[in-house]
């Protein structure tokens, strides 16, 4: 009886695993297990432009992450694979008719190597596009690593350490806009965020180089036309070669590895 009541309540538009579990005095995991056991969602046909993304699924399974298969253009969920291991995804796509798989033209993924392998082996006509969000995320991590390395050179009581620590978010912000100046007791002056960013970049030529390269990539990603993207990206990758930062050289290798 409990199972039937749980399934019935899960049909409600506003129902969540947590709310249903609380109402029936069972755990969220038990509620999810009931759903997984008795509810079978039909797979939707593959679209021409797919997106493979991961989601954390807190179930009793050994696998913490599931793979979502989505129509990239409509954001419609096509299917869920409750495991993102290579053999599971290869087997999943193998069961889909080859004619249907061959119609897929593009697949958008993050920088998870398994997704790339699966696309190459099971979706032979598809081109891979790495989600720009994840590229920017990796660039921000590279800049963050440069900042931390530079910061460790300074005494914790120094102004340089203070700026690099307290205002680190300015280096990762997509846009640092002009704001009203406020008095900063530590710096003993009225100052706004763009001015603080300038002070941070003057601390280290390496940090300034890493930051400017990250901003340049973000600009290329946003404004470059498809027909000129190949040439401009390779020019940018070549420019990265001159960076003195090992963190940027690592990022350069990542871009080359994923270039297609």
Model-predicted regions and their roles:
Residues 14-15, 102:
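Residue-level signal for the short linker/turn that defines the boundary of a DNA-recognition helix
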Residues 155-227:
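An anionic, glycine-rich sequence signature occurring as long contiguous blocks
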Residues 19-24:
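Short alpha-helical "recognition helix" segments of helix-turn-helix
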Residues 26-118, 125:
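RNase H-like nuclease fold core
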Residues 110-113, 119-166:
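Conserved beta-strand -> loop -> alpha-helix junction used to position metal-binding or nucleic-acid-contacting
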Residues 10-12:
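Short amphipathic helical patch at the helix-1/turn junction of helix-turn-helix
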Residues 1-8:
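Basic, short loop/linker segments at the boundary and entry of helix-turn-helix/winged-helix-like folds
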Residues 219-260:
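Amphipathic alpha-helical
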